[in-house]
Regions:
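Short, structured coil segments at secondary-structure junctions
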Residues: 62-64, 117-118
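Acidic catalytic patch
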Residues: 64-85
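Generic structural signal for small/hydrophobic residues in well-ordered secondary structure
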Residues: 6-7, 45, 79, 99, ...
């Protein structure tokens, strides 16, 4: 199994939200083939206005524990297909497309944003 971590999950893990930390810690000790995040997620996490230098360093250290999935032509084309069929913001379309291309379960608290995307499997850390 593969997991793609959404922005809110990484932010929650950094903030120490217990259900998210428990889910990620459990996943890292399980037999997951891959745990990563989209390059769009890195932009969202680190591009936050007012981020302190200490928080940026902490977030970069957190991101370094996982693989980054690039936004390549295949991801962009899949995101275009998604946006043609579902009303969704561009970053979420890129994340969803990445999950589909990588055949990964999308781990997110924003399950509603992804519910109408065909073929995506969404996991909420609060219910794991």
């Amino acid at each position: 199994m593969r997991w793609l971590l959404d922005t809110n999950v990484l932010i929650d893990a950094f903030a120490g939200r217990s259900d998210t930390v428990r889910a990620i810690t459990g996943a890292r000790t399980a037999t997951l083939e891959w745990i990563g995040y989209s390059a769009a997620t890195r932009l969202e996490v680190l591009g936050f206005p007012g981020l302190t230098a200490a928080d940026e360093l902490g977030l970069r250290n957190l991101l370094a524990q996982f693989s980054e999935a690039p936004i390549d032509a295949a991801v962009i084309e899949r995101a275009i297909e998604i946006r043609k069929s579902v009303r969704i913001k561009i970053p979420d379309a890129l994340v969803a497309a990445t999950a589909l291309i990588y055949e990964a379960h999308l781990v997110t608290r924003n399950t509603v944003d992804f519910k109408n995307i065909h073929g995506i499997f969404v996991l909420d850390p609060a219910t794991m």
